[in-house]
Amino acid sequence: MGIKQLSKLLRENSKRGIRERPLVYYSSKKVAIDASMSMYQFLIAVRSGGATLGNEDSPTSHLVGFFYRTIRMVELGITPVYVFDGVPPEIKMKELEKRKERRAAADREYREASEVGDKELMEMYDKRKTKVTGVHVDECKRLLGLMGIPFETAPSEAEAYCALLCKKKAVYGVATEDMDALTFGSPVVLRNFNGTQSKRLPVMEHNLPQILEDLSLDHSEFIDLCILLGCDYCSTLKGIGPKKALGLIKKHRSIGNILKNEDLEVPGDWRYSDAQKIFGSLAEIGEIRDFNISWDSIDRNGIVNFLVEEKGFDLERVNKGIDKLINSRKKGTQGRLDCFITRSK
């Protein structure tokens, strides 16, 4: 879910904190990529024309996306570092259960639309019922390994681990559509990083220090603002929209002071303090030490066996993609990724 309406609030209140850049700007830069978000984007991107299916009628659009988009990044001199979700925090389980219920409802609506042949509704509900599964994750990790592309599995939330990489200056920025990467403290967050290649959209670069300056908030106050807006870890408060949330934080400087001084309807199970702790500390979870992540070798035969023999991809297209990947790596524009993390695949 990310942070509700944060993007809109920042567009209206921090114009200096958001810049449009072409994808080529990130040539020679290292970018941490929220892998789960990328998989979801690739899975729903082909829904209008029907899912891309492999040999056994299993969806392969996530593999199509990871293979060709990653090659395009490498061609541009971008070093992608994919980060996969680890174990979600306990407080997020309620939100995950809600998502499960929404997907089940969407599945029912999809079947009803299918019965009457309403293709527009079918497409809408097909996207809503889409879920990234463990199979998708394992297949993408396998493909990245065969391609020699760096990837990590976070101890918990991928966005938090990506934020840590950025704070440690291991990467230039974090590519995700979830705005809570800012809440976790990532200095730079890149939206439209995947979409820019197919839709020719600019990358929207969010600069956290500039955003905090424009909003006249420190990071702990920004965390409280995001909690008021609505996040994955606790519900929103009735009657609190973006404008009011920002006004309350600027007036009282913390949720604790707001609750002491304002007459608000607060649910008994509103666990805002737990959300504060997660946003304030989750990105620091895990052993930190000097660590070197280098590009691994490209396994052409392994890629062909996986994508062509197992998944039914076109051999000529796959080989052309591998050639592009090899040639781009030979140019020596990628280098090595030196960062301070524990390898956790």
From Swiss-Prot:
A Pfam cross-reference name: XPG_I
Region annotation N-domain: where it falls in the sequence: 1-103
Disulfide linkage: none
Keyword Amino-acid biosynthesis: no
Post-translational modification: Phosphorylated. Phosphorylation upon DNA damage induces relocalization to the nuclear plasma.
Cofactor binding description: Binds 2 magnesium ions per subunit. They probably participate in the reaction catalyzed by the enzyme. May bind an additional third magnesium ion after substrate binding.
InterPro entries in the cross-refs: 5-3_exonuclease_C_sf, Flap_endonuc, HhH2, PIN-like_dom_sf, XPG-I_dom, XPG/Rad2, XPG_DNA_repair_N
Residues bound to Mg(2+) 1: D34, D85, E157, E159
GO BP terms: base-excision repair; DNA replication, removal of RNA primer
An example Gene Ontology molecular-function term: 5'-flap endonuclease activity
Keywords: DNA damage, DNA repair, DNA replication, Endonuclease, Exonuclease, Hydrolase, Magnesium, Metal-binding, Mitochondrion, Nuclease, Nucleus, Phosphoprotein
Interaction with PCNA: annotated span: 333-341
SUPFAM superfamilies hit by this protein: 5' to 3' exonuclease, C-terminal subdomain, PIN domain-like
Enzyme type, top EC level: hydrolase
Protein's cellular compartments: Nucleus, Nucleolus; Nucleus, Nucleoplasm; Mitochondrion
Cofactor(s) needed for function: Mg(2+)
Positions annotated to bind DNA: R47, R69, E157, G230, D232
Residues noted as binding Mg(2+) 2 in the record, renumbered to the chain: D178, D180, D232
EC number per UniProt: 3.1.-.-
The family this protein is said to belong to: Belongs to the XPG/RAD2 endonuclease family. FEN1 subfamily.
Task performed by this protein: Structure-specific nuclease with 5'-flap endonuclease and 5'-3' exonuclease activities involved in DNA replication and repair. During DNA replication, cleaves the 5'-overhanging flap structure that is generated by displacement synthesis when DNA polymerase encounters the 5'-end of a downstream Okazaki fragment. It enters the flap from the 5'-end and then tracks to cleave the flap base, leaving a nick for ligation. Also involved in the long patch base excision repair (LP-BER) pathway, by cleaving within the apurinic/apyrimidinic (AP) site-terminated flap.
Quaternary structure, from the entry: Interacts with PCNA. Three molecules of FEN1 bind to one PCNA trimer with each molecule binding to one PCNA monomer. PCNA stimulates the nuclease activity without altering cleavage specificity.
HAMAP family, alphabetized: Fen (MF_00614)
Protein name: Flap endonuclease 1
Organism of derivation: Encephalitozoon cuniculi (strain GB-M1)
Lineage: Eukaryota, Fungi, Fungi incertae sedis, Microsporidia, Unikaryonidae
